[in-house]
């Protein structure tokens, strides 16, 4: 499959591994991974799927996830129903990353694309890891898809780029 473009349907059968929040920020409290059917979830409403190369890594932590957390209210005001972060880390690491960032509910989902199946399928995996990209989906249709190819850059996939797209398209 080629990279996603605005106007494309979000692919069918995209499933990630996910540990639902327990309400606790205790990193030693482990949930059990379940499947998260992204194709089904993204079929309704407005969603932002953000991929990062790795949880707890400098750019991913310092620029990417913290930006989306800080501007979550602005995303909601722009009509975003859900924010999903994916990385090639396993579901346990992704769950811990969410907790380490103070997320104890489903305001932002931390999902695992551990074998990079999805990222590879759209050509945005890099050396066994997920690439750094953002995809905005409204009612199952891609309205924005962009990948950052410059190391450390979040110019195309960061929260400000996403908010600009949402603002330029009205409230989608």
Curated annotation (Swiss-Prot):
Keywords: Antioxidant, Cytoplasm, Disulfide bond, Isopeptide bond, Metal-binding, Oxidoreductase, Peroxidase, Redox-active center, Ubl conjugation, Zinc
Main location: cytoplasm
Cell compartments where the protein resides: Cytoplasm
Key word Ribosomal protein present: no
Record function comment: Thiol-specific peroxidase that catalyzes the reduction of hydrogen peroxide and organic hydroperoxides to water and alcohols, respectively. Plays a role in cell protection against oxidative stress by detoxifying peroxides and as sensor of hydrogen peroxide-mediated signaling events. Preferentially eliminates organic peroxides rather than hydrogen peroxide. Relays alkyl hydroperoxides as a signal to the transcription factor CAD1/YAP2 by inducing the formation of intramolecular disulfide bonds in CAD1, which causes its nuclear accumulation and activation. Involved in cellular Mn(2+) homeostasis.
InterPro entries the record matches: PRX5-like, Redoxin, Thioredoxin-like_sf, Thioredoxin_domain
GO cellular component term of the entry, any: peroxisome
Domain of life where this protein originates: Eukaryota
EC code: 1.11.1.24
Modifications the protein undergoes after translation, according to the UniProt entry: Conjugated to URM1, a ubiquitin-like protein, in response to oxidative stresses. The attachment of URM1 to lysine residues exclusively depends on the presence of a peroxidatic cysteine in the target protein, with low specificity for the particular residue, motif, or structural context at which urmylation can occur. The URM1-conjugation reaction is mechanistically and directly coupled to the process of cysteine persulfidation, transfering the sulfur atom of the URM1 thiocarboxyl group to redox-active cysteine residues in the target protein if it is exposed to oxidative conditions. Persulfidated on specific redox-active cysteine residues. Persulfidation (also called protein S-sulfhydration) may provide a molecular mechanism that enables cells to protect vulnerable cysteine residues from reactive oxygen species (ROS) under stress conditions.
Name this protein carries in UniProt: Peroxiredoxin AHP1
Pfam families: Redoxin (PF08534)
Positions carrying Cysteine persulfide: 60
Similarity section: Belongs to the peroxiredoxin family. Prx5 subfamily.
GO biological process: cell redox homeostasis; cellular response to oxidative stress; hydrogen peroxide catabolic process
Reaction catalysed by this enzyme: a hydroperoxide + [thioredoxin]-dithiol = an alcohol + [thioredoxin]-disulfide + H2O
Subunit structure: Homodimer; disulfide-linked, upon oxidation.
Cross-link (Glycyl lysine isopeptide (Lys-Gly) (interchain with G-Cter in URM1)) at residue(s): 44, 63, 99, 141, 156, 171
Record-annotated Thioredoxin domain positions: 4-171
Keyword Zinc: yes
PANTHER family: PEROXIREDOXIN, PEROXIREDOXIN-5, MITOCHONDRIAL
Record GO terms (molecular function): metal ion binding; thioredoxin peroxidase activity
Catalytic residue list: 60
Gene: AHP1
Signal peptide bounds: none
Miscellaneous field: The active site is a conserved redox-active cysteine residue, the peroxidatic cysteine (C(P)), which makes the nucleophilic attack on the peroxide substrate. The peroxide oxidizes the C(P)-SH to cysteine sulfenic acid (C(P)-SOH), which then reacts with another cysteine residue, the resolving cysteine (C(R)), to form a disulfide bridge. The disulfide is subsequently reduced by an appropriate electron donor to complete the catalytic cycle. In this typical 2-Cys Prx, C(R) is provided by the other dimeric subunit to form an intersubunit disulfide.
């Amino acid at each position: 499959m080629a990279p996603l473009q605005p106007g494309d349907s979000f692919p069918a059968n995209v499933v990630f591994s996910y540990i639902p929040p327990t309400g606790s920020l205790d990193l030693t409290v482990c949930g059990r991974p379940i499947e998260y059917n992204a194709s089904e979830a993204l079929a309704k409403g407005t969603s932002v799927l953000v991929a990062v190369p790795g949880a707890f890594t400098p750019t991913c932590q310092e620029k990417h996830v913290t930006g989306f957390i800080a501007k979550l209210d602005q995303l909601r005001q722009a009509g975003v129903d859900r924010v999903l972060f994916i990385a090639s880390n396993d579901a346990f690491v992704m769950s811990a990353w969410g907790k380490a960032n103070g997320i104890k509910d489903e305001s932002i989902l931390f999902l695992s694309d551990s074998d990079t199946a999805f990222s590879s399928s759209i050509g945005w995996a890099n050396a066994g890891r997920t690439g750094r990209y953002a995809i905005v989906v409204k009612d199952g249709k891609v309205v924005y898809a962009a990948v950052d190819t410059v190391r450390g850059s979040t110019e195309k996939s960061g929260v400000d780029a996403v908010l600009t797209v949402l603002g330029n398209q009205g409230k989608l």
